[in-house]
Amino acid sequence: ASVSKDFIGKDASVLARAAGLDVKPDTQLLFAETDAKHPFVEEEQMMPFLPIVRVRSVEEGIERSLEAEHEYRHTSIIHSHDVENMTAMARALDTTLFIKNGPCMAGLGLGGEGYLSYSIATPTGEGVTNPKTFTRVRRCVMVDNLRIY
């Protein structure tokens, strides 16, 4: 099985309808529990669906994340209040974009730290770029924590 390209860029209600569900047209995100080898975990989706994989510990969660990331070193995300867990995941996955407590788009400057940018992330390029240099800059983003005001 694989993720259907027909659903790339479609809104959540289109995906829900295809799954036999009826949701409000303004639904922004679908989520469901699945196993670690499901295509929604293994493949890039580019659609509003969040697969949830149940694990017994943060260590197992990091291990499963590492497997799903396939050593592309592109993007990883964690939601946690424990900075040590965030640090352990950052070190294990070593991705160009690492977002803590926010959506993946925060790593590109949408709702997170830094300027709006595009990612030419590994393995296809050099990560977050800017118009002046178009070279790789590593960004580490944390949302809603460590505020100084």
Regions from the PLM with identified roles:
Residues A1, D11-A18, T34-K37:
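Glycine-rich, charged/polar anion/phosphate-binding loops
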Residues G20-Y149:
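Conserved C-terminal structural/oligomerization subdomain of aldehyde/semialdehyde dehydrogenase
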